[in-house]
Amino acid sequence: MAVPHWTPADIPSLGGRTALITGANSGIGYRTAQVLAERGARILLAGRRPASLAEAARRLRADVPGARLETVELDLGDLSAIRDAAAPLAATETLDLLINNAGVMDVPERRTTSDGLELTVGTNHFGHFALTAHLMPALARSTAARVVTVSAIAATWRSGDLDDLMSERHYRPMGAYAKSKRANVVFTQELARRLDGTAHRALVVHPGSAVTNLQRHTSSGRMGRLFVALAARTLMGTADGAAWPTLYAATHPEAVSGTFIGPAGRDQTSGTPKPVPLPARADSPGQGAWLWCESERLTGVPFPALQT
């Protein structure tokens, strides 16, 4: 059910709360950081390129005078870099919100991360899985932490089936992207099950169709051009409106753990956030347990329990 009149103006004060946002230097991530900072949250801007992070911090301080923020250099395609970036935060921080927002899309040819994982799923899913695992001690210090992972409408595509997760038998750029986004949903469902009975929540969102810097990672190939063209014809939104599902999931007091949140408008392209149907089998405990075990095995990162 959509929340008919909800807008980011309804977000309560977030003073005393800390949020880490990946991919926060532009697009949906930047807009999310901006709104949370306006509500008083302390923001940790996480991104791969130091120069882009510094520019984002400069812009955010100009947009939100008095904003409390820091930058975290983080390459989600490098498991060692994730571990090193997360270690000091896990040791000292109290993290109330973790927003797994960064992503890559439509890599033209099959490539791998520095750890040998297919690049798209390695960044979009395995990188965020490892980051979340490493940050669990910081999340556990919060009285009510939330992990919000940004998926995409592509999670519902048939090509998003998790068979051949690493695209070893057959690689298609948008198929790999759909798999990574389906994995985001399945991961969140399993995390929500593991958080059941605690004060903590895990939610997954999709932003509809938005013109953001993710399109800069889109190839000039036929599928990439087709995706952007179709999105443009379906009222492709801006990062402002596309950030609403993330902001709702991160802040609304009644947001339910395990829910998939997307826009309420036609074809889920834009509009007020609402719970939307999960992709096929995404809530299967068997598939969730399988992906969890595969993620621990392939990343070498054991996922600790998060207690109340």
Residue ranges of model-derived segments:
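Generic alpha-helix initiation/capping and coil-helix boundary signal
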Residues: 26, 49-50, 113, 235, ...
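Flexible internal linker/loop segments at domain or repeat junctions
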Residues: 224-226
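Pocket-edge positions in alpha/beta enzyme catalytic cores
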Residues: 45, 74, 234, 280-283
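Rossmann-fold NAD(P)H-dependent dehydrogenase/reductase core
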Residues: 1-220, 298-306
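C-terminal helical subdomain
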Residues: 180, 229-276, 285-289, 293, ...
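Short, contiguous pre-domain boundary segments
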Residues: 1-6, 270-281
